[in-house]
């Protein structure tokens, strides 16, 4: 979407440890495969969230399900895992990190909320350069950021809201690295990558 709006060029990305989505159920659900998810209710977090909406939707498609027609997806924000615990939904799709935090908060084990499917690692958070910048300058900026990445990551993670980047690193990136996100948009019925989905 950024590319479509600005023609900006990706030049680096910041990785996120354990940045992938999962589909989980309650241990007593009786659900063990994709076919059994048909006709069920599944909670997710927020519309447009990479790990909380796009990632789980892509998992469903990869398992042969249409998230728009084969099951009822409920976007419940921060209440999505509580809905699974309460039995208000049959399954949940979202960030593996959120899943880990939920288990810890509940004093639960993975066997209490088994993971049915695990998605691929989601693309790293991208850094973009204006199309108007001299490519030589972009190269120089890239080299300096890579050479000083320990200090940059330390500065980023010094903020409480950025703890998701603890253990991250700066890596080279290209536009095709985000094809999986384009496929995720298509999984939720969006085929034009000109506007962000959600808030």
Region spans (language model):
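Short, glycine-/small- and polar/acidic-enriched structural segments
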Residues: 1-30
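Alpha-helical secondary-structure segments
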Residues: 36-41, 143-144
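Pocket-lining segment of extracytoplasmic ligand-binding domains
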Residues: 29, 40-137
